Amino acid sequence: NWDVAYAERLLKEFGLDRERKTRVDKLSKGMMSMVTITLALASRAPFTFLDEPVAGLDVVARERFYQLLLEDYGETGRTFVVSTHILDETNGVFERVVILDEGKVLENTPTDSLLEQFRLVDGPAEAVEAACTGLKVLSRETLGRRLSCVVRGTPEQLAALPADLDAGALNLQKVFVALCGHGEVLNHE
């Protein structure tokens, strides 16, 4: 399945065409990541596994990687399994998320389904406490008379939160921290 033309295009786009005579062990970490990305994408393998593919890349190159990934998926429909710790950059990229913590699978679900289960509820402490009844409270922070809680519930429970409280959606990174932050999980059931 190796796609020579695609590999050449990626090498040129990443500026690696000028480095052809450089030994691989002499490349920077970012350049090594670009070589790995080129090999993975140009392989055209039906299942492609990438472990921390953006390590060492600057923000522009990381953004371009995710664009390339989406373009490739759109053209071929092949499956990509990507492990990363830079979750903010993956918003809107992955259909499914698997969250691991110390080797244990905490979540294995469609990304949208996971995100719709979490909210950051903020407002007067008493009102937030009352609103969180029946929800799983994963973290809480008090500032004066205000209380902020990260909560998990069904979409119906979250839709029923009082309109006078701020109840913002969380991005994937915030959900990950809530699930893996190892703080005390407080149940208000």
Question: What are these language model-derived features?
Answer:
Residues K104-A127:
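Conserved beta-strand-loop-alpha-helix hinge in the C-terminal portion
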Residues N1-D101, L106-E107:
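ABC transporter nucleotide-binding domains
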Residues A127-C132, E156-A160:
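Short, conserved charged micro-motifs
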Residues R18, A125, G153-P155:
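Non-catalytic surface loops within mature trypsin-like serine protease
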Residues S139, L143-E189:
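C-terminal coupling/interaction segments
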Residues L87, V128, L172-Q173:
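Alpha-helix N-cap/helix-start and coil->helix boundary motif
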